[in-house]
From Swiss-Prot:
Classification of source organism: Bacteria, Pseudomonadati, Pseudomonadota, Betaproteobacteria, Burkholderiales
Pfam families documented for this protein: G3P_acyltransf
Name this polypeptide is given: Glycerol-3-phosphate acyltransferase
One Gene Ontology term from the biological process aspect of the record: phospholipid biosynthetic process
Main location per the UniProt record: membrane
HAMAP family reported in the protein's UniProt record: PlsY
């Protein structure tokens, strides 16, 4: 029962869309209504408001970190086990992708996934973030960096911690993140994906 309750709480935390919340508080249009329609930091940046984009990025990462950290810190006293913690990690990510507060129209999950990985294991999170930075620096594609980082994350976890129940959760998160980037993948293959710093290609 503890596993299910903590997972439900994590899903509700994940369902808070900081792109929507920050935009509303700062008088910006709903992120679903412009650009890619994706409620994430990259789309919020298209308004030209860098502060709003940064706050969105921090908020989305923080909720992923917070849900897992709280469960790991306080959950065992209430009967939460390793399977439950893996459920929490997956649930907060699903909350971001399919938020109950926003008609299940969520973001792609890059920042939230980063927060989750940092909470699971700081070295794992930093290693995955380093992978993103390296790919982004050399190739200048944010989406490609996210895809490569998502592919490597489960392998990093196995190398550091072996195969466990959390491996399965990280693998599912990676698959879902890649699936959320299917339009970006098509644009990359067609040479139409915008590079970091470029204006959005039509």
């Amino acid at each position: 029962m503890a596993n299910l309750l903590f997972a439900l709480a994590a899903y509700l935390i994940g369902s808070v869309s900081f792109a929507v919340v920050v935009s509303k508080l700062m008088g910006l249009p709903d992120p679903h209504s412009y650009g890619s329609g994706n409620p994430g930091a990259t789309n919020v940046l298209r308004t030209g408001n860098k502060k709003a984009a940064i706050l969105t990025l921090i908020g989305d990462a923080l909720k992923g970190w917070l849900a897992v950290w709280l469960a790991a810190r306080f959950g065992p006293a209430y009967g939460l086990n390793e399977t439950g913690l893996a459920m929490v990690a997956l649930a907060v990510f699903l909350g971001h992708l399919f938020p109950v507060y926003h008609r299940f129209a969520g973001g792609k999950g890059v920042a939230t996934a980063a927060g989750i990985l940092l909470a699971i294991d700081p070295i794992l999170g930093l290693g995955t973030l380093a992978t993103w930075l390296i790919i982004a620096f050399f190739f200048r594609y944010s989406s490609l960096a996210a895809l490569v980082a998502a592919i490597f994350a489960p392998f990093f976890h196995v190398l550091m911690n072996g195969v466990d129940v959390m491996t399965g959760a990280i693998f599912v998160i990676s698959v879902l993140l890649i699936a959320r980037h299917r339009q970006n993948i098509a644009k990359l293959l067609a040479g139409k994906e915008s590079r970091i710093g470029e204006k959005k290609k039509v």
